[in-house]
Amino acid sequence: MMKPVPKLWVVISSAFVFCLLVLFQINKSDLIEANLQITHQVNNFLISFVASSNNQILNHTKHANESDGIRAKQLEEEETDTCAGRYIYMYNLPSTFNDDIIKECRPLIKWFDMCPFMVNSGLGPQILVSDKTTARVLTVKTGSWYSTNQFLLSVIFRERMKHYECLTNNSSLASAIYVPYYAGFDVSRHLWGYNVTVRDELAIKLAQWLRERPEWGKMYGRDHFFVTGRIGWDFRRFHDEDSDWGSKLMLLPEFSNLTMLGIETTAWANEFAIPYPTYFHPKSLTEIWRWQKKVKSVKRKYLFSFVGGPRPKLDGSIRGEIIKQCLASHGKCNFLNCFVNDCDNPVKIMKVFENSVFCLQPSGDSYTRRSIFDSILAGCIPVFFSPGSGYNQYIWYFPKDYTKYSVYIPENEMRNGTVSLKNILGMIAKERILRMRKEVVKIIPKIIYNKPGFGPEKIEDAFDIAVDRMLERVAMVKRMMEEGKDVQSQYYSQTKDLKKLEIIHEKTA
């Protein structure tokens, strides 16, 4: 039997429990309040953090979208911009480097008055129908035939550049920079009777002018080019003797970085040959087609021909042997002797070439001749005697397989007198001749300089090909510079062997 709990103990116990309950309630309230405050702060932090993160994400996404949008727009513009990668900037040179040079046209070339040929933006006097021969030889009714002088290439090129579809006034957009310097006329007016200081004076001034231009620092001139109507050796005088020929333009440090386009190159890798100007400067594709049709179907009276003169004082010249064989060919060869005939008459020259199956192209004072392009224009198959006269010069224009459009006879065989031109050319089958002439006629649009403002039809002429290949060259050099490769030795200093004959047989389609 349990003992009864005393009443006092019960009262004390009850009071103690009550106090504990009161204290517990008070602490519980404090804890709850504290917890609520902490929770509120944490929530505020989390809300602020999340909001901040979301804002950063949104901002980042916004900027990314904007960047993507800009890039997409740029890509879209590049895709729609037909001039992307083709823009060319033409320096506005002081007139002392071009226009002022040709204003005094009479003394530009000693013993020859250049003034009559300056008209029509360098194309020369227009050839009009004066007799039946002119009408029969040329398609003069088109108004596209001119008495064009070969040395005016730089003037013709500059005029074409003024009409180039991707010419820009913003040099930062340009992929290449054209320097409209009349280097050929600058040197030719000082070749006789002037010392080397006078010959080099303007070139040195231009080098300094270029070096001070903001465009120069981009590639130090490796994206610059100029055009001349003279051969490369006129600008590579290695000594400073007054008796030495030419100027030292291409030996100046600045110009050693430039690319020169001229009618004939030396062995240096920063020179490229472009065609001599012909007499034909069409203004439409129809004119070209009409001319091609004419020369493709014309009946040719002579097996071969030679337009030129002997070079008795030139060591190693084969012209004497060529003339000898031509005169002894019993009517198979037509010889137009430029020592006694007017070889500046376009009608006379084109008549000879149009009447010939093959046209002989021996070297003269230098490797190349304007006659090469006049004969091709006439649909006459060229006969070369040195690789340096055509194959290793006009690499942008002629097929790599020279057998497709020409005949090659080594100079040595002509000197030895062991070759009969009449026999070699006479043994070529008619079927092959037709194939070769077809190829020659295909080349015609590539070797002529169309009139500025050519019709809407697109066909690449000599100017277009030169510009496109120049842009490709600059792009390659720029890529190599970005990769840290040596461009100087490969693209500017390296020499090539102009006498080497490289046999390449192209696959026929």
From Swiss-Prot:
Q: Does the keyword Secreted apply?
A: no
Could you list this entry's UniProt keywords, alphabetically sorted: Glycoprotein, Glycosyltransferase, Golgi apparatus, Membrane, Signal-anchor, Transferase, Transmembrane, Transmembrane helix
Q: What is its main location?
A: Golgi
Give the matching Pfam families. Exostosin_GT47
Topology check: give the Cytoplasmic ranges: 1-3
Q: Which residues lie on this side of the membrane: Lumenal?
A: 25-509
Q: What is its EC number?
A: 2.4.1.-
Q: How does the protein's chain sit in the membrane according to the entry?
A: Single-pass type II membrane protein
Glycan attachment positions: 27, 59, 65, 169-170, 195, 257, 416
One annotated GO molecular function is: glycosyltransferase activity
- Free-text tissue specificity from the UniProt record: Expressed in pollen grains.
Name a biological process GO annotation.
protein glycosylation
Q: What is the annotated localization of this protein?
A: Golgi apparatus membrane
Q: Name one GO cellular component term.
A: Golgi membrane
InterPro entries (UniProt xref): Exostosin (IPR004263), Exostosin_GT47 (IPR040911)
Question: Main EC class of this protein?
Answer: transferase
Where are its TM segments located? 4-24
Family per similarity comment: Belongs to the glycosyltransferase 47 family.
Functional description taken from the UniProt entry = Functions in xyloglucan synthesis by adding side chains to the xylosylated glucan backbone. Involved in the galactosylation of hemicellulose xyloglucan.
Q: What is this protein called?
A: Probable xyloglucan galactosyltransferase GT12
